Design a protein with these regions (language model features):
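Short, compositionally biased P/S/T/A/G/V-rich stretches that sit at domain boundaries
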Residues: 235-304, 318-321, 381-422, 511-521
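A short beta-turn/strand-edge loop motif at beta-sheet boundaries
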Residues: 286, 301-309, 352, 434-442
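Bacterial Sec-dependent N-terminal signal peptides
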Residues: 1-25, 128-131, 146
Length: 521
C-alpha cells in the first residue's frame, strides 16, 4: 500500500477581507430591521425573546413574501421552562400586506400581530428553545422544520466553515448572493471563556469583498464586514468588542419554494470530514483491487424520530450507483449524531474496469427504506482511479493539518477601548495562516511583568489563506498589570497534531528560533 500525505502550504495565497474570490458587488437585499423584543416576540410563550434564528429566517421570508402559510404541525416542549409549543402551520396565514419592514415608529395592532405570528411560526419550525435568551440548538431539527413547515428549498444545506478552505467558503457564499439569495449565517463571539452564539443574515457584498450583515438588532450594527471578523461592535476580534468570527456556519439555498412538497421524513447528514485509514493527515493511498482500506465518517439523523440506520459506502460511476460495498447498522435519536466516528472497511471489486469512480456515503432506515445519498455538511466524495488492477484512493482535504501560523509583525500594545467595561491591556497580533488548514484553538500569551511570568489563553479561529488582525484583551483580573512594567511578551498556538504549543514568530514557522517579542509598557 502506497501512502501520500498532502502539502498544504500556500505561501503566496492570502484572502484578506479585500480579496474575496470572484468578488462581484451585490447590494444589500433585506430592507427589514427586526429584533427579538416587542412587537416581534408578542406571540412567543410568556413573551420570551423571539430568538435570533427565528428573526433571521423571518427577515429572509419577508424579502420573498412567501410562503402564504405554513405546512403541517409541530408539537414539542421547549427548554428549561418547559413551554408547550403547539403550532398548526396550516392555520398560520402570513399577513404579508401588514408586515412592515421596520417597527421602530408607529404601527397598528394588526401590523404587530402580523410580524409576531410570522416570527413565532419561524421559531416553532426551527424548534427554538424559548426563554430570556431563546436559542436554536439542533441544526438537523432546524433544517427539517424549515423544509417541512416553511417549505425552504429541498437543496438547503447546513455547512460548517471548518470543513472548507477560505477560497471554497467564499466562492459558495458569493454564489448564493449573486443568485439573489440572502444567507442564514451563524457565528460565535468567544471572550473570557464565554461562547455567545448568534444567527444573522448575510445579504450583500461590496467591491472590497466585505459582506453586508443584518445582525437582527433593529438595524444596530448592520454593516459591511470582513468575513473573518464579523464585528457587530468594535473593530477586531479577541476582546470585549462583539465579533461573531468563531464557529462559522451557513445555510445555503435558504429560500422558500412553496410549490415543493416532497420532503424526506428521514435522511442522514455527514457531520465531519472523511478520514482515510484513521490517519488525519493521510489524503491518498494506492491499493490493489480487493484490498481493504478504512474510511471513517460521522452521521447525524435528519428526522423527528429515532431511526435504525443502515449506512455504508456506495460505488458510483458517472453519477450512477453501482453497488453498496460495505454497510453497518446503528440506532440514532432524532437530530442527534454518533458519539464517535464510525470506521468502515472498504474493498473495491476485483472485477472493476479501469476508469474514474467515486465512493459516496449512502444510508437507508426504517423510516426511509430506500438507499439515498447522505447529505453533506462536510465534503464526502472520495475519488477512486482504477488502472491495471490498482486503485488510487483520494479523500477530500479535511483542512485539519498544521496551519503553520506566524505573525506579520511584532506584537504591539494598543489602546484598550473597553477599559470602562473590562480593565486590562490589549495587544495587537497580526496573524497569517498560509495554508488551507483552518485553526480554532488555544492562543497563549506569555507575559513577563516586572520579572513575574503570567500566561493568558484565549480560543480564537485563524482561517486558512488569511491575514487577520486580533486585538487580544488581557483582563486585569488575569494579569496584575496595574502600576507594573511589561518586560516581554510572546505568543504561541496549540497544535493538536503535536499536542503542544508552537511559538509564533515573525517568519514562517520553518524558522528554528522564534524570538521573544518586546512591547512598550
Amino acid at each position: 500500500m502506497k501512502k501520500i500525505y498532502s502539502t498544504t502550504l500556500l505561501a503566496a495565497i492570502f484572502l484578506p477581507c479585500n480579496m474575496a474570490v470572484s468578488a462581484q458587488e451585490v447590494a444589500p437585499m433585506l430592507t427589514t430591521k427586526y429584533s427579538q423584543m416587542a412587537p416581534y416576540n408578542n406571540s412567543c410563550p410568556e413573551k420570551s425573546a423571539a430568538g435570533c434564528g427565528p428573526v433571521a429566517i423571518a427577515q429572509i421570508l419577508t424579502k420573498y413574501k412567501q410562503p402564504v402559510h405554513g405546512y403541517g404541525t409541530v408539537s414539542y416542549q421547549s427548554g428549561a421552562n418547559k413551554y408547550d409549543v403547539d403550532v398548526d402551520f396550516e392555520s398560520y396565514t402570513f399577513d404579508w400586506v401588514n408586515i412592515k419592514d421596520d417597527y421602530r415608529g408607529e404601527y397598528t395592532d394588526q401590523q404587530a400581530k402580523a410580524v409576531a405570528d410570522l416570527i413565532y411560526a419561524c421559531g416553532a419550525a426551527m424548534y427554538a428553545q424559548y426563554g430570556s435568551s431563546t436559542g436554536v440548538n439542533n441544526y438537523a431539527k432546524m433544517l427539517y422544520g424549515l423544509q417541512h413547515n416553511l417549505h425552504i428549498s429541498e437543496n438547503a444545506r447546513y455547512l460548517r466553515r471548518q470543513h472548507y478552505s477560505t477560497a471554497e467558503w467564499i466562492e459558495m457564499l458569493n454564489t448564493q448572493l449573486r443568485a439573489g439569495h440572502p444567507v442564514l449565517y451563524r457565528g460565535s463571539w468567544l471572550f473570557e471563556e464565554e461562547d455567545n452564539g448568534h444567527m444573522f443574515v448575510i445579504d450583500g457584498l461590496d467591491a472590497d469583498g466585505k459582506y453586508h450583515v443584518n445582525f437582527g438588532h433593529f438595524g444596530s450594527g448592520d454593516k459591511f464586514a470582513d468575513i473573518n471578523v464579523l464585528n457587530q461592535s468594535g473593530t477586531n476580534p479577541g476582546g470585549r468588542g462583539v465579533c461573531y468570527n468563531a464557529k462559522q456556519a451557513m445555510v445555503i439555498n435558504c429560500y422558500p419554494t412553496p410549490e415543493h412538497t416532497d420532503y424526506p421524513l428521514q435522511r442522514c447528514i455527514s457531520e465531519e470530514a472523511i478520514i482515510l485509514n484513521k490517519d488525519t493527515l493521510l489524503r491518498q493511498i494506492t491499493v490493489n483491487l480487493g484490498e481493504n482500506f478504512t474510511l471513517s465518517c460521522n452521521l447525524r439523523n435528519y428526522s423527528l424520530q429515532k431511526a435504525t440506520l443502515n449506512y455504508g459506502w456506495g460505488l458510483e460511476k458517472d453519477g450512477q450507483l453501482i453497488d453498496i460495498l460495505c454497510q453497518s447498522t446503528d440506532g440514532l435519536s432524532a437530530g442527534e449524531k454518533f458519539e464517535e466516528a464510525r470506521h468502515l472497511d472498504v474493498a473495491l471489486p476485483t472485477t472493476l474496469e479501469d476508469g474514474e469512480y467515486k465512493l459516496v456515503l449512502y444510508s437507508m432506515s426504517d423510516i426511509n427504506p430506500t438507499w439515498s445519498r447522505v447529505w453533506a455538511s462536510a465534503p464526502t466524495e472520495v475519488e477512486a482511479t482504477v488502472k491495471n488492477g490498482m486503485a488510487g484512493i483520494t479523500v477530500p482535504d479535511n483542512h485539519l493539518g498544521d496551519p503553520k501560523l506566524y505573525l506579520e509583525q511584532d506584537i504591539t500594545e494598543v489602546e484598550n477601548t473597553f477599559e470602562k467595561f473590562v480593565p486590562g491591556r490589549t495587544f495587537e497580533l497580526k496573524f497569517i495562516n498560509p495554508t488551507t488548514n483552518n485553526f480554532q484553538n488555544k492562543i497563549k500569551l506569555e507575559i513577563l511583568v516586572d520579572g513575574e511570568e503570567y500566561s493568558y489563553i484565549t480560543i480564537q479561529p485563524v482561517f486558512s489563506q488569511s491575514k487577520t488582525i486580533y486585538h487580544i484583551l488581557v483582563p486585569q483580573s488575569a494579569v496584575a498589570f496595574q502600576g507594573k512594567h511589561i518586560t516581554s511578551i510572546k505568543a504561541s498556538y496549540y497544535n493538536t497534531l503535536d499536542d503542544d504549543y508552537t511559538l509564533l514568530g515573525t517568519t514562517e514557522p520553518s524558522a528554528v528560533n522564534v524570538p521573544t517579542t518586546r512591547v512598550s509598557s
